[in-house]
Amino acid sequence: GRQMARLPVDVKLARMLVAANTHSVLHELLIISSFMGIQDPRERPAEAKEAADNAHRQFTDNASEFMAIINLWRGYRQAHEECSQSQLRKWCEKNYLSYLRLREWRELHRQLLITSQELQWPLPAWQDVEQRLVLGLTESKSAQLHYALIHRALLAGLPTQIGHKNDKGQYEAPRKR
């Protein structure tokens, strides 16, 4: 509880981060929870829905929307490192992403990173995380375990968002809602 109170995000997101620390997937959950703490930076204007969908497709992950968020972060991070501010704005525009919301995401991620360091939560080097994420694209047992641990940490903060498809093809939430 005390650790969660220090995190500058909603209680559900803070719970995910505590679980992520336990499961050693904190780096990935810092990315996902900071994304969930802002308005979605992906833009989809009515007049360019198909073009926006095509631009966003480069970040998709067939198995998980949460992994797509990590892909988006990696793409943004690379563009942020390689581009000037005006080039980054053009990259955002070309990819139908809100420059201001991406900046807000980066700032919230930075705040969460600093707080996690103050809490003395261990963080692997970014290169190690990159290697884990690349391995996540394979079907190895360790990659599957890593993927499962990310989703287990996510579920810690979203217990009411879990659903089960019944025999009639309808989804039921916990407590049969």
What are these regions (language model features)?
Residues 1-176:
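Second RecA-like catalytic domain
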